[in-house]
Amino acid sequence: MLDKHGREINYLRVSVTDRCNLRCVYCMPPEGIIKKEHDNIMRYEEIFKVVKSASLLGVNKIRFTGGEPLILKNIDKLIYNTSKISSIKDIAMTTNAILLEDMVEELKKAGLKRVNISLDSLKEDRFKSITRGGDINKVFKSIEKSLSIGMRPIKINTVIMKGINDDEIDDFMNLTKEYPISVRFIELMPIGEGRRLYKDGYISSEEIISKHSDLIPVETEKSSTALLYKFKESKENIGFISPMSCKFCSGCNRVRLTSEGTLKPCLHSEKEVNLKNYVGNNQALLSKINETIYNKPLEHHMIEEKESKSKKMMYQIGG
């Protein structure tokens, strides 16, 4: 369906849980999070109701996120049921891949089309530091397994932070020459724990691109959040997601469902609607989703204000 600004909204990002088995420095506090009561989070059946209703309004792309979506007990069942909605054309997931190796084959059979893997360092000790305890070898094994079963595309999402991992930019780029893997560099955002790191850690996409004259621009869809490039030798693209230096609001085609059941029309807006109050009434749920999509804000003002208006952490909204 169209919002009031004429944009086609066909993409729903679903945070199935705010819990995670890592505690990345820009996402979660060191002590982790307080576990929510069961009644305060969406059950898998409720999530599916929202997905089904959204599909009736023209949503045909679903991405499951977290927290870490693979710790949700029924994630395979949720993917399978979503795949049976005839109008849903694409089911994707963003994961840290710690648990992916043992699950990816069944998830692919259930209907998962592609994965984005959050990976902010290729160095074992640094990865452990950024994630506060993660085992990078589990991620590497998950990538290898995903490639071996034909999962395509596989994209690596990397948040670049000055003085932390910016010396690995070339190493990440070179992955696209060696493997059929896309890499997405994401600008650090002043949201949640990222506010602490932003002043000293922010690097613009343009700064990175300007240092790589051999990058070749690739045509990008209007709704894409990434500007795409590749090397002559690349097997896949290199993308730059630049919410702080080049916002993509005019082509935005997405809304977000949080693990608490709130529908956010914009990542960086305070505006949200609690759909848990409506999941028992199909018509009311459909109407509330329709209303929220229609009233999606024209744009965010994070570039001008250097801060997101959203008071939620990224693990609550979905990465």
From Swiss-Prot:
Gene Ontology molecular function: any one: cyclic pyranopterin monophosphate synthase activity
Gene: moaA
Lineage, opening ranks: Bacteria, Bacillati, Bacillota, Clostridia, Eubacteriales
Radical SAM core domain segment(s): 4-227
Necessary cofactors: [4Fe-4S] cluster
Pfam families named among the record's database cross-references: Fer4_12, Mob_synth_C, Radical_SAM
Function: Catalyzes the cyclization of GTP to (8S)-3',8-cyclo-7,8-dihydroguanosine 5'-triphosphate.
Residues that bind [4Fe-4S] cluster 2: 249, 252, 266
Family: Belongs to the radical SAM superfamily. MoaA family.
Any one GO BP annotation for this protein: Mo-molybdopterin cofactor biosynthetic process
Recorded catalytic activity of this chain's protein: GTP + AH2 + S-adenosyl-L-methionine = (8S)-3',8-cyclo-7,8-dihydroguanosine 5'-triphosphate + 5'-deoxyadenosine + L-methionine + A + H(+)
Gene3D superfamilies the UniProt entry points to: Aldolase class I
Descriptive protein name: GTP 3',8-cyclase
Pathways per UniProt: Cofactor biosynthesis; molybdopterin biosynthesis
